[in-house]
């Protein structure tokens, strides 16, 4: 990337840490995630696609149904420093009606960019296990399928976070 500050911050010499092969990739900006998706022949999901994957067609509040169940998501981290995210597929009982895993509670997920004539922002979905106490900048959790965060995009180095990753989609043919 043009601005590599904090890019893949947990990685060393181009490699993820030992034992991290199944964890979400974090410390990537929206541009980084888009570049990877394009390289892989995919793209980032539109917000409505993420919503459909999480909610299905029956309007459920959470990917698994309408009743909150903390055992279906990673345990919250309320400390000052973040632990590593959970492995992908670590919570299979939290799958959506389409069997999509880890839609909520592991890391926030980039969706395609939101832009109007005044603002450049991105819609973030899924919420994160990281829930710092007393933080004035970190937006509240969004576990429900009908909740999201909106992040004002400043510069790639500011947009990268250990609590923010992405997933890719591919158009059906």
Predicted regions and their residues:
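Functional-site microenvironments in short loops/helix caps that host divalent-cation chemistry
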Residues: 6-150, 157-162
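Short, structured beta-strand segments at or near domain termini in extracellular proteins/domains
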Residues: 162-173
């Amino acid at each position: 990337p043009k601005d590599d500050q904090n890019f893949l911050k947990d990685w060393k010499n181009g490699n993820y840490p030992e034992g991290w092969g199944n964890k979400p990739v974090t410390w990537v900006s929206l541009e980084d995630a888009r570049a990877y998706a394009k390289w892989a022949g995919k793209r980032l999901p539109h917000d409505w696609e993420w919503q459909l994957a999480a909610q299905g067609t029956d309007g459920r509040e959470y990917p698994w149904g309408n009743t909150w169940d903390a055992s279906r998501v990673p345990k919250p981290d309320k400390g000052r420093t973040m632990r590593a995210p959970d492995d992908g597929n670590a919570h299979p009982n939290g799958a959506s009606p389409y069997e999509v895993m880890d839609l909520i509670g592991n890391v926030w997920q980039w969706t395609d960019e939101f832009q109007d004539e005044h603002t450049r922002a991105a819609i973030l979905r899924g919420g994160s296990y990281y829930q710092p106490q007393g933080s004035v900048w970190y937006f509240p959790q969004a576990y429900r399928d009908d909740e999201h965060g909106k992040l004002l995009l400043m510069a790639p180095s500011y947009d990268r976070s250990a609590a923010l990753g992405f997933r890719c989609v591919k158009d059906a043919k």
